[in-house]
């Protein structure tokens, strides 16, 4: 069984460095999906490619996926979400060699799961509820719409590859167990 940490990447170089360093001892592969377009549909440079020398010590663990095809929805009311979702969907391109029992983490680059909670994983889709911070670690958010006021962000998703391949059953998502205080998010 291997652990694959999967996330879209825009340009958050310091957060990427923190994430790779923090999860390096437990993760077998990092699947970094970088789009050629911003969430607004504008062309963007590939920041990971420009800075990959900074991450040389992780190069044998990194699978860098370049998402370069997008639906033509620029100008639609929700086009920013369409570009974001389409980039995130590129994660599957980096999981071609996975086995059914491999563990898949799906996050944003700024969502840091508590690795001590990984042992609680029982094969069901799991959502880590994470502490959330804005801009600095002393600016914790304690009340926002996603969490009924408990200051926890529904962040990292953990599931096995067998479930990932068959993500058509919405009921499995509804039955998710939430791990409280399973780490933090830094925006």
Regions found by a protein language model. Name each.
Residues 1-25:
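N-proximal low-complexity "stem/linker" segments adjacent to membrane-targeting elements
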Residues 3, 28, 102, 110, ...:
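Conserved acidic residues
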Residues 19-28, 118-125:
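Short, surface-exposed basic-aromatic patches at helix termini and helix-loop junctions that form
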Residues 31, 63-65, 105, 126, ...:
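Hydrophobic/aromatic beta-strand patches that form the interior of the parallel beta-sheet core
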Residues 37-106, 115-116:
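Active-site-proximal specificity loops/subdomain of glycosyltransferases
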Residues 111-187:
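Conserved catalytic core of nucleotide-sugar-dependent glycosyltransferases
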